[in-house]
């Protein structure tokens, strides 16, 4: 009786409590492949918590709580999600009142029709690395991915998010500078245009100030056109004179002297008419010309009138 009690006590002491039986060493579990059965034996404690770990023997780190405070029945149906990175350094931990046990290392990978997504992992306890002997869980030399990724990802995210505004602000400042430059250039072009317009205005002013001489020239041309317009009248007079001359030539020789004298009188009257026309033209030119007309211009006009008179007389003769 005493011997059997001692033997049962020794056997119970040699057995580990809540020892994992599945998953087995180096098992391959499919993410998204359906329900996987997790089992353990030599039960103790009324409730247990199931946790997923990852990492090497010297840096084993909890990454997600699978089930918290479940009844200690020795089994759990685990429907593996598809957001775990495919790797071979996963294991399960079972915590209970008085201790914790671990499974052997196993592999997680996506099923043939599944795609691994990304999601935030949730762990309810304090994240700290644990060292477990290879004789208990197997051997892995990889370091903790969770600590590395969790510490680097937020910082990289914050750095990228912090760099984005600066980049945006630098772009905004560049855009502002560009718009300022374009505005300045447009203002410069406007100033250039204004200066060009000012120079044009000054040029127009200079042309306006030079208008008296052009007025004199136009007056000169007006006098010329006036004289030219008077020329047809003198031509009409010469036509009348020629007609009279032809009439006189039909008379007999006895009246030739009287015809000659009549021609002379007509020439005299034509000369008087041309002189009067020239005088009126000169008066018109003088009235249309400005008060500051040069003597040379007046002399030219008088000479032009004289040439017209002489030409008319020569035509009659």
Swiss-Prot record:
A Gene Ontology term for the protein's cellular component: cell surface
Entry coiled-coil feature ranges: none
Glycosylation sites: 42
Superkingdom: Eukaryota
Chain intervals with Low complexity compositional bias: 150-238, 247-259
The keyword Lipid metabolism belongs to this UniProt entry's keyword annotation: no
InterPro entries: Kre9/Knh1-like_N, SRP1/TIP1-like
UniProt entry keywords in alphabetical sequence: Glycoprotein, Signal
Region (Disordered): 150-259
Leader peptide range in chain numbering: 1-16
Protein's name in the database: Uncharacterized serine-rich protein C1E8.05
